[in-house]
Amino acid sequence: MNGFFEEAKQRKVYRVAAAYLIAAAGVIQMASAAFPAWELPNWGLRLVIVLLLLGFPIALMLAWAYDITAQGLVVTPTTAVPRAHRRRNIIMLVATGVTISATAGFFLLPRVSAHKIDKSIAVLPFENLSEEKTNAFFADGMQDEILTNLSRIADLRVISRTSVMQYKSGIARNLREIGQQLGVAHVVEGSVQRSGSRVRINAQLVDVRTDRHLWGQTYDRDLADVFAIQSEIATTIADQLEAKLSPAEKDAIERAPTSDITAFDLYTLAKNLCLTAFGSSTTKANLLQAADLLNQAVARDPSFLQAYCQLAFAHDGVYFVGFDHTPARLAQAESAVQAASRLQPNAGETHLARAQNLYWGYLDYDGALAELEVATQSLPNHPRVVELKGYIKRRQGRWDESIRDLNRAIELDPHNILTLQQTAQTHQVLRRYVDEKSLLARALAFEPNDAVTKVQHAFVELDSKADTRPLHQMIESIRPAAIPSIANNWLVCALAERDGTAAENALTAFGGSQITFGSAENVLFNRLFVEGVIARITKNEDRARSAFIAARAEQEKIIQAQPNYGPALCVLGLIDAGLGRREEALREGRRAVEVLPVEKDQFGGNVMTG
């Protein structure tokens, strides 16, 4: 053993080993700093380290065999040792070099591998640079398609469009602050200019933690190439973030949604309407207008899958909310789902549309959940998939699972105020008032002027403590800016305080909006019934009875069109109760509960029995 160390010293192996290790450490340190700055991939740094580790045993062997002299590189003279000892010393040299390299690699490579790229991303609204400002919807469509393509990639975490809508282009945007608010490391921003048959699209990827532009490109092409550009942008961004792209994901990204630009324009307009339909005073009008636009889109391109799926959503929404709970409306939704199934039966959008239809159209919870499980495989970042799971499970009474799914939807869509409100209402049903207020406060943190959320937050005190004062004060503070949107809560507050004048003012504020008395469910009351309730609390019995009789006649027409719709039967029962028709009211109430028992729907059923 001593012979090995003596010979290694004589051949200056120690000196070479020390010099190599110092130089390698310097190279690794410089590469660790330079690779990110030069936007080089992480695997490149790992390759440098591996090559340096492999080179160490080779350097030792070269130092053993050669020496540098004034005459140049010469073979080191062989010492007078037995041949067997020389062989042993060479084996020990190689073993030592390999052991040191392996040990260094054990500590270095995991640390480099642990430096993974944060693959979270948000696609901000694109700026419309077209001379025709009406083309703004086209810029929306560009952003939405790029976002949709990225959301197909399971290796990315993509924030939903609803949460980025507030960061409109054309105003100063602090990208670092936006990244912190959305919980992402990267954002995509860009602009679109459409002129005749040409389109210019600029897109750039920014690391918001450092404000570094990782990639940028301007595309100046024919309008017919717009979908190829969208696919190219999504694929390039995935490459920049080193996202793993499966063959199925790649195929889905490269598949153009339609070949008809006009059909795409119609679809984009309709999708924008659907995106903001619920939770507003124009839900019915928006859904019906969207359905009309989508019918035009599929007439132009009968192979437009996404348009059929969105069309099914619009019809299912009109049916489920109770605007038109008729077999004819459900048949239109079913027809759109079947068209999507014929076109692409295995597409994630098809499974999502079918799940929505099974849930909203038939209350087939198990069937809908099965479809959503399949949809998850190709739509891993789609918040609607997990959001629907949450809504379905709360109707099944699987409350904790429901809240977990809804919280997951909020992670993917953190600024979706409707999802936050619905999750808060789930806590309300469970009387978890602290959690309810916390979620509503979270919504107000990014939408401090949202009247509905402000009133909902104040409503918790009425619901939990029968204290109308916070709600009353809040309503007083925001009138008349957003009267139609808060009219339901205003009406409830006025009736709770037995204030007939305030109740009449609230009723006037409804305009054409639906009256739900603040219910989270689809129990729609007609205006005449409310007039009867107000007349009763103001002791005007003649007026109350006249209003209830007229309300009953109106409600009977609804029942004739949809005889097995529980919420409509529930309202008829309440009208008969107002008329003092006790037996009829009980019969209609029982019928409503038979049609929609609590066992079938623990969320909506509780509203009707409560």
PLM feature spans:
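An N-terminal, helix-rich hydrophobic module
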Residues: 1-107, 183, 212
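Acidic, proline/glycine-rich low-complexity intrinsically disordered segments
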Residues: 6, 34-38, 88-493, 497-535, ...
